[in-house]
Amino acid sequence: MERTYPYAWIIPFIPLPVTVLVGLGLLVVPNATKKIRRMWAFISVLLLSIALLFSINISIQQIGGSSIYQYLWSWTINNDFSLEFGYLIDSLTSIMLILITTVGIMVLIYSDNYMSHDQGYLRFFAYLNFFNASMLGLVTSSNLIQIYIFWELVGMCSYLLIGFWFTRPSAANACQKAFVTNRVGDFGLLLGILGLYWITGSFEFRDLFEIFNILVHNNTINLFFAALCASLLFLGAIAKSAQFPLHVWLPDAMEGPTPISALIHAATMVAAGIFLVARLFPLFINLPYIMYFISLIGIITVLLGATLALAQRDIKRSLAYSTMSQLGYIMLAMGIGSYRAALFHLITHAYSKALLFLGSGSIIHSMEPIVGYSPDKSQNMVLMGGLTKYVPITKTTFLLGTLSLCGIPPLACFWSKDEILNDSWLYSPIFAIIAYSTAGLTAFYMFRVYLLTFDGHLRIHFTNLNGAKSRSLYSISIWGKEESNLNNTNCFLSEINKNDEKVFFFSKKTYKIGKYARNRMFSFSIFFGNEIVFPYPHESDSTMLLSVCVLGLFTLFVGFIGIPLNQGIVDFDILSKWLTPSINLLHKNAHYSVDWYEFVINAIFSVSIALFGIFIASFLYGSVFSSFKSLDLINSFETKGKKRIFLDRILNVIYNWSDNRGYIDTLFSLYLTRNIRKLSELTHSFDKRLIDGITNGVGVASFFVGEGFKYVGGGRISSYLFVYLSYVSVFLVVIYYFVL
């Protein structure tokens, strides 16, 4: 019984040896460490697998009905202050442990091949293992101080990995942007922690919740101050989980390697904010205004993220805005008190989004030898299309992740999102309408990404990458500004140098990736006489596909752990059993179940909205659009005059909103960043001219006084003695007449 619990403190330290040994190896014996660099990937996977075994054992005990376990070590104790460190094992901890270790293992296996060409391979694995260790430490923390320490470590690792390719100016700027934005949230979190300690006198979660509840129920607390502290705590979660308005760092974070994008969006950085809200849920639930504020931020983020994803060309940024929107759903669920649905969607979204990001990495990996290693080209969906026959396994798994995020049964996200939608309707019809509408938008933009990537023809061979001005041959927006004409290759061929010189599809400005780069014979276009041989994408290697396929299985089956169907014979709802200790703390005698009729009616409505979004995306981007266009149905619609012009204006507004990131970055740049820079310049000028002027003036004055005395003295000792005695005499006279 609970034999694993006393040793659970080991879990956060299990991945650390790789970070320490790689760091020491690169400092002491760099050449020997680099020669065995691929070995560190195996060790990383092995150690994290050991952590997974611990996590599975703990989770089985939690599902079996084990109680909450906490162990503390006293750090410092006196009469007025005590600080303890330890670990807390409950259902929330066990869920997060499983999530971090499973996704982390898949990312490690995937990264071994994905990063094999990079000179920073060892540095990447050192950061990655430290990232996993920090997140494991965060979810097992037993008090707010411990959480804050690991919170900062998680942030530090994310900054290092976002700016991993720091020689790229865009990556360096993205790292800086993530750091500055999260500083705002982290400062709020620190103030909130100090405020809660002022109220309760404790950092430990159990004591803090108990004391806070007593104070609220007895009305012996200033509710405004308590709400302010809770808001500051939530500010940390807003920044970490990329909620409005501190979401601006998330799209730029795509400058990091794709495996890191998968880990950040699935199980670490953005999940940390959700975890904090879930951990402090017993505190927030006593403050109704804070719960409403959480739900409001969530619903705004749901809609904003979906609208910003509509017109993105970068495949990773499209997925980033999707993450922002889905995390908004989770925050909405937390705010309306649907604790179970929030954690359920956290689980299902994590596996689906990890699958999509690793799938996008496989796509990027296949496109890089053709278009070059610039993210502007290898991640650009304009240059993709028709990849189904080149990367069939990636296509199948990517489709699974897309359908899951769209909310199509029986895939994972269908079960959790449907539960959030139903609960939101009970809480607020307005919130429910926005949530249901965004579900349709989610289906639209996700299927848009899928169709632009895999449907149609490979557009790279019909696109001019050499900088010559030419009309685009394929429309990638829904606004109908340009028509597709993939059959006419004369436009492309006319751009080729008439002297029959070799034409490369590489960008003229490429990024050096080191001596480990793969040498692929089919990575460029060559002329053989008058015939052009085009390169084509290729399927990823087996280790990358293994991770993608395993995550595909999770996406297929993980939703079944939370099926809310209990007819008295078989209870499929493993998640409720898993969460029983935590749910009982929040709601006494709580039991979650839904009958068949209600469940089916709600599911039909939500799936219909998702299918409508998929239909619109297929009509505008898929083969259906081409078929209708050949029948001139679109052209007949275009002749409707004023109605068509009005519709185009609306679509252009939506397009510009999405393409310009909702103008939020622009507003921050104009009114916040610029003013802060001016204030910094003003304070710098004040410091340089006044503060430094006083300090330097004293030094300069002393110098000139010394020089004057030097010339007066002339170097004779008798003169020095005369001046010295004169000063002493004057001093004694002054003392005698004015003091005595």
Curated annotation (Swiss-Prot):
Keywords of this entry: Chloroplast, Membrane, NAD, NADP, Plastid, Plastoquinone, Quinone, Thylakoid, Translocase, Transmembrane, Transmembrane helix, Transport
GO cellular component, one term: chloroplast thylakoid membrane
Single GO MF annotation: NADH dehydrogenase (ubiquinone) activity
UniProt key word Membrane: yes
Record localization: Plastid, Chloroplast thylakoid membrane
Annotated GO biological process: ATP synthesis coupled electron transport; electron transport coupled proton transport
Lipid metabolism recorded as keyword: no
Annotated coiled-coil segments of the chain: none
InterPro entries the UniProt entry points to: NADH_UbQ_OxRdtase_chlpt_su5_C, NADHpl_OxRdtase_5_subgr, ND/Mrp_TM, NU5C-like, Proton_antipo_N
A Pfam family assignment: Proton_antipo_C
Transmembrane segments: 9-29, 40-60, 89-109, 125-145, 147-167, 185-205, 219-239, 258-278, 290-310, 327-347, 354-374, 396-416, 425-445, 521-538, 545-565, 599-619, 720-740
Main location: plastid
Membrane-protein topology: Multi-pass membrane protein
Signal peptide: none
PANTHER family assigned to the protein according to its UniProt record, in alphabetical order: NADH-UBIQUINONE OXIDOREDUCTASE CHAIN 5
Family per similarity comment: Belongs to the complex I subunit 5 family.
Subunit note: NDH is composed of at least 16 different subunits, 5 of which are encoded in the nucleus.
Function: NDH shuttles electrons from NAD(P)H:plastoquinone, via FMN and iron-sulfur (Fe-S) centers, to quinones in the photosynthetic chain and possibly in a chloroplast respiratory chain. The immediate electron acceptor for the enzyme in this species is believed to be plastoquinone. Couples the redox reaction to proton translocation, and thus conserves the redox energy in a proton gradient.
Listed name of the protein: NAD(P)H-quinone oxidoreductase subunit 5, chloroplastic
Organism: Piper cenocladum (Ant piper)
Gene (UniProt): ndhF
